[in-house]
């Protein structure tokens, strides 16, 4: 199976002023594409040659896992955002966040802290556990909750390439801007 760079669900400049077109040109067009290219090279002639990204994440290790997970993680991340979104969730998602975290404000603070305090590169995730509870996790590097059987709901990419052109070393500023882009309808659809 040849993996391809999926089309972004919006134009490269659509997330401005929060994420610049220049950042997306590099983040999506260079970094995400490189993970796809590297994955295809690595799986050729292996047991993973015809595997889905999900199977690669659950079963592979090393470079195949790293590149496969990064392809999946980035696609998931792009689909967490939409131009002119943000605000707060409503309905079932809002109720579940209150049940699990006390309030939306508490959830937002805990998720932001997890994203800001992750040492080095990686991802902050909101995941649904097998018992139905929602938890916030930190995954270093290419970490992905599918590997441990969790169900991803939301992610924030905290690799420096996600924000360095716009925010330099100010990761918390990038995280604050991230909240202005969240597509709560898409996120709620993952419950």
Regions found by a protein language model. Name each.
Residues 1-191:
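Feature for soluble, non-membrane regions of globular proteins
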């Amino acid at each position: 199976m040849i993996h391809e760079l999926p089309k972004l669900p919006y134009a490269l400049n659509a997330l401005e002023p929060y994420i610049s077109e220049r950042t997306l040109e590099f983040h999506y067009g260079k970094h995400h594409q490189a993970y796809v290219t590297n994955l295809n090279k690595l799986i050729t002639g292996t047991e993973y040659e015809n595997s889905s990204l999900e199977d690669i994440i659950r079963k592979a290790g090393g470079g195949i896992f790293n590149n496969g997970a990064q392809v999946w993680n980035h696609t998931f991340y792009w689909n967490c955002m939409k131009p002119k979104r943000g605000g707060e969730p409503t309905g079932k998602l809002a109720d579940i966040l209150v049940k699990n975290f006390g309030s939306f404000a508490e959830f937002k603070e805990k998720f932001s802290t997890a994203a800001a305090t992750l040492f080095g590169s990686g991802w902050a995730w909101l995941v649904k556990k097998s018992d139905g509870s929602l938890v916030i996790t930190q995954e270093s590097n290419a970490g992905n909750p599918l590997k441990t059987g969790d169900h991803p709901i939301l992610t924030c990419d905290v690799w420096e390439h996600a924000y360095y052109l716009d925010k330099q070393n100010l990761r918390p500023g990038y995280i604050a801007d991230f909240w202005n882009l969240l597509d709560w309808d898409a996120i709620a659809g993952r419950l």
